[in-house]
Structure formats: C-alpha cells, structure tokens
Amino acid sequence: MAEKKLNGTVIVTYRCNARCTMCNRYKAPSRPEEELSIETIKKLPKMYFTNITGGEPFIRQDLKDIVRELYKKSDRIVISTNGFFTDRIIDLCEEFPNVGIRISIEGLQHTNDTIRGLENGYNRGYATLKKLVELKHPDVGFGMTVQDLNAPDLVPLYKISDELGMEFATASLHNSFYFVEAKNIIRDRPMVAKNFEDLVNELLRSNSPKKWFRAYFNHGLINYIYGQPRLLPCDMAF
C-alpha cells in the first residue's frame, strides 16, 4: 500500500513586523519559547506539500533549519511572507533553490503600506520579487487579500505580475482564528465584484490554460463575497 501523505500548513511564529488592518495577530504574538521547535517538526508526518507561514516566518532566525528538516518529509515547500526581509529571503533561496516564495502585496505602494501599516513595505516586497526574478528563482509569486480599499488595484497588480512572469494569487477578505479578528467584512460588494470581473476578463485574454483556471477561481470569489456557495469546495480536514 502506498504511503499516505498530507498537505499541511506549518505556522512557525505568530510574531509579525506588519500591522495589517485585517489582522490583529501582532497584538498577540507568540513568545519564541512557545513556537514550534525543530524537535517537534521532526515528528510531523510525511507531506506532499507544506506551506510555511506565520506571523512573518522570516522573523525566525532558525528558518533555514526548519526548511532543512521539512525537506526530509515534504515533496514541496512554499513560504508565505510579506517580503520585507529581502536579504534573509535571498540567502535562504540560495541554499534551497527549489523552495517556493509567495509574497503578500496588498495593493500599489500607498494602498499596500496603508493596509499593512508597514513603512516602505511595498518597495521592500517588490524589491524582493525583482531580486528573485533576477536570480531566476523558479518558484516565486505574489498575491493579495482583496477588500474595499485595494480592489481597484487588482488589475494593476496582475499586470505587474504578468510583466515579471510570475504567479498572481488572490483571496477575498475573511476572518480567521489566527488573525485574532472576527469583524472583517466587504462593504461595497458591487464595486469589489466589478474589479474581480475585470481581473477575470484579463486572465481570459491570456493563452495560458492555467490563467483560465485562475479566472474560474476568481469568478468563484465573486460568489463567495455575495455569500453564495463556493465553486471550488474546500476539502481541508477531510
């Protein structure tokens, strides 16, 4: 019988250098001694795919050790980050050239820095993306959590990703236990939906079947913000 593997998310810290408007995690950070240890990570099961997230993962000074240990049990690893710690990210990618990097950018410069409460956050994140492209890192992309404030930046950010030749992922504003926030809500749903429609049309103009699938996914997000059933059901925990 084939060995059963999982897809998993490893939250390596609840510390974060950003102050995002949709996330209060920075108000309740973990203490370093509370965070997952290397010994605990060694006990994790085999996985097809592992997402390393936080908090901001690159706050952990031993992140390389964590990645090294997870590669013993995971076929693919992607790290979610705000991209602020450029030197640390590049250093890790040079040692682990197959690791995926996904940088969260919440809009163009003013919008991103307003939402993230992180001075120079956009410039630092974009500089990290550019550096990874220059180094020809094979698995890099960025994405945004769409809300009222940044919806008009959806298509401009997609065009930046297209120029850089990288993945562009989207999510709709939502609540989560690790956000320590339960009041996130999209208020101008028609406006946000219209910007999603514009993105869908841009994606469908592509010759890439993968972008056509992303168009379908983003169409599903319109359903989601109107409280309708998801087109792609979530099967986590099943």
Predicted regions and their residues:
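Generic low-polarity alpha-helical segments
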Residues: 40-43, 234-238
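Radical SAM enzyme [4Fe-4S]-AdoMet core and its adjacent flexible, acidic
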Residues: 34, 69, 73, 99-106, ...
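Conserved alpha-helical substructure of the radical SAM core
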Residues: 1-99, 177, 188-195, 199
